[in-house]
């Protein structure tokens, strides 16, 4: 796997979230379907951030070739290959990703507390849970912020 595949995965997840969001906003979508779509959007959103943080780390460490043979995967596996976004962010900062210091959600909190809470609460297990606080409106703000992070990382770490 080449490190650019992290960027490609993030892009695919972002496109999927936007399409699912359009479907969830559709007035003809039934409530049960809307709830499932919102949960799927929320679940995928974390993988956009996770993939882009991995991309930034690999880019800043000049990883070339197979990522599985690189330092983050071989030597720091338990700190790099995690689903905890704050742990991954801290690992990125410790490994030269200083351009991430002021991105939304981590050190610079989002101005909308509901949007910030979505980020703070994200974890893989939510795929299997019911979240009553998810709505297309709040997820639209959340995905828009994540897209901003995606663009920022893309600009700072594409070599």
Regions found by a protein language model. Name each.
Residues 1-159:
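Terminal alpha-helical segments
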């Amino acid at each position: 796997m080449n490190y650019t595949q992290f960027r490609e995965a993030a892009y695919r997840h972002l496109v999927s979230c936007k399409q699912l969001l359009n479907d969830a906003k559709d007035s003809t979508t039934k409530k049960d379907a809307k709830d499932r779509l919102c949960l799927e959007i929320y679940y995928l959103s974390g993988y956009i951030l996770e993939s882009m943080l991995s991309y930034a780390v690999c880019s800043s460490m000049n990883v070339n070739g197979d990522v599985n043979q690189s330092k983050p995967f071989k030597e720091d596996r338990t700190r790099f290959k995690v689903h905890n976004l704050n742990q991954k962010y801290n690992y990125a900062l410790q490994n030269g990703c200083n351009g991430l210091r002021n991105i939304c959600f981590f050190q610079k909190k989002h101005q909308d507390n509901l949007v910030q809470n979505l980020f703070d609460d994200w974890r893989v297990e939510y795929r299997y849970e019911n979240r009553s606080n998810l709505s297309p409106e709040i997820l639209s703000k959340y995905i828009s912020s994540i897209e901003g992070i995606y663009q920022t990382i893309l600009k700072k770490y594409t070599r």
